[in-house]
Amino acid sequence: MRILQVVRTMNIGGLENFVKNMLQYLSEKCDCGCLICDEKKSDHEDDLVKAGIKIYHIPEPDKTKINLYNNLQAFFETHREYDIVHCHMAGTNGIVSKAAKDAGINKVVCHSHGVALQQDEALSMKLYMLCMRKLMQRHADAFIACSKAAGNYLYGQESFGEVGKVVPNGIEINRYRYSDDERNSCREELGFKESDFVIGHTGSLNSVKNQELILDIAGILKEKRIPVKVLLVGGGNREQDLKKQAKDLKIEEDVIITGKQMGVTKFLDAMDVFMFPSRSEGFGLSLLEAEANGLPCVVSDKIQPEVKVLNSVLSVSLNEPIQCWIEAVEKAKVLGRSKMANEILDEKGMSEAACYETVWKIYNEVLSK
């Protein structure tokens, strides 16, 4: 079997990490390739090449997406050796599906990793998504989504309800297992005292992730003379805004922004409470990693139920006043780490092996039709 994954980029991020790990897992079962719709080299490419995965590039899409269809079709016509094209391009999956089938690719699997954003409410975007759904319904052979909400958003509730499958994003659970030694080492490296209360977060620094709420909470806790520290693991276009906010709140000495990181486990070890106040999430892989580390978590009501596995995940509505968030953080602090996190997640089928085996089963079902 030959499988080609189609992605926008392979830089560090939840979707990209999922595809990278899936490629590495499936490469032991079949021939795998990855088509990146961007000519720039991505963060994960070297790791994929080491695993024997073929990497291809085409130019990034323009605003009209016409060049995307033309470039995809030209690529697929010269790579008909692939049995299945698996697309991870959100709404643009419709264009990928049509280009693949028009070029003679036998089977197409579409994968949804996200839910509606504020800009998706515009009439032009709604019409665009309607067209993309029609293309996917006509050309795709299987619909996968990381959550029910993600499936309903991309494919439409009726279509996804009839033929779609929810495959929660899995992780290598043991990779995130908590270590006292790593905690002490990382906290020392970051300059944290044993008495410091560290609120942490991992993810891209952007408006959707809503990290400014974490800083607001830290500012209030600081006024209460709580020795709070904030650890933001990631990089993004909001970094300077967040640094300015920290300065305005007079907590700049208590906030660390690490920038992009290839591994997050040691940083999770250093945290006391994990916050994930996103305005929108298709799944929330970072939250699952924090749960695997045993961290008590405070999350927004926009997080999908599929990823809220442990009882130590506390959900607060974004419409609630900030005092409700502070109370949740204080409750999480009292809860402490879960000592059975790894075993519970494995039992609930949240391992990457369980996830990728489900995808492998879907591939075989698609080829048998």
Question: What do the PLM-derived regions correspond to, one by one?
Answer:
Residues K260, R279:
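Aromatic "clamp/platform" in nucleotide-sugar-dependent glycosyltransferases that forms part
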Residues Q5-L68, F75, G164-V166, G236-E239, ...:
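N-terminal strand-loop element at the rim of the active site
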Residues R138-R177:
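A short, active-site helix/loop in glycosyltransferases that binds the activated sugar's phosphate group
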Residues C87-I95, S112:
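Short His-centered aromatic/hydrophobic patch
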Residues L35-I36, P296-S300, P305:
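Short hydrophobic beta-strand element within catalytic cores of glycosyltransferases
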Residues G13-N21, F197, H201-I220, N237-K243:
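A conserved mid-protein helix/loop that constitutes part of the nucleotide-sugar donor-binding site
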Residues G14, G336-K369:
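A charged, aromatic-enriched C-terminal amphipathic alpha-helix characteristic of glycosyltransferases
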